[in-house]
Amino acid sequence: MIRVEVCDDMDYVKEVIMDDEMWDRCADDYTVKDPSIVDMMGCIWLKCFVDEKPSGVVSLHHSSTSVADIHIYIPKDNRGKNTKDIGHCVLNWVKDNAVSTLHKLNTKIPVIYKDVIRFAHSIGFENEGYDRRSIMKNGELIDRVCFGLSISEIKT
């Protein structure tokens, strides 16, 4: 069984985010790897479970009253057959629990992470363009794909 709940276990959030492989994928070259950054992100954290085992976290950060940025962090050991189901569970949690003014979710994914781009498409996000040369990865400025999903488009 897959479920999602609000996370107040910041130690687990930091464990996921500070993992070397995860950090390399989600941070740009200029961001100092410091666990206190998680406390400063100003977002709502969700914790994902598969068969009651913690299996990832999600950050939701309002960029306006109508839009939230979402990032799903699934540790490498938990990726695979349940990844898409985790994504759908997260989206359904947002649809069921978000404030009434939230109408859309956005995310930006570096173009080098084809697996994450496929994941975003697989759970319903639509490509809305590019944020050109917007993140420094491995010493090179690269593009990010901009994805969006209206709350009304979330499939239950």
Over which residues does each language-model region extend?
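Conserved acetyl-CoA binding element of GNAT-fold acetyltransferases
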Residues: 61, 65-77, 108
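Conserved acetyl-CoA-binding loop-helix of GNAT-fold acetyltransferases
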Residues: 80-96, 118
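Glycine-rich acetyl-CoA-binding "A-motif" of GNAT/NAT acetyltransferases
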Residues: 53-56, 115, 141
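Conserved beta-strand-loop-alpha-helix junction that forms the acyl-donor binding cleft
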Residues: 105-121, 134-135
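Short amphipathic alpha-helix that is part of the acyltransferase structural core
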Residues: 1-30
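A short helix-loop-beta-strand connector motif used in the catalytic cores of GNAT acetyltransferases and
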Residues: 35-49, 56
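Conserved beta-strand in the GNAT
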Residues: 47, 53-61, 68-69
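Conserved catalytic-core motifs of GNAT/GCN5-like acyltransferases
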Residues: 108, 126-142
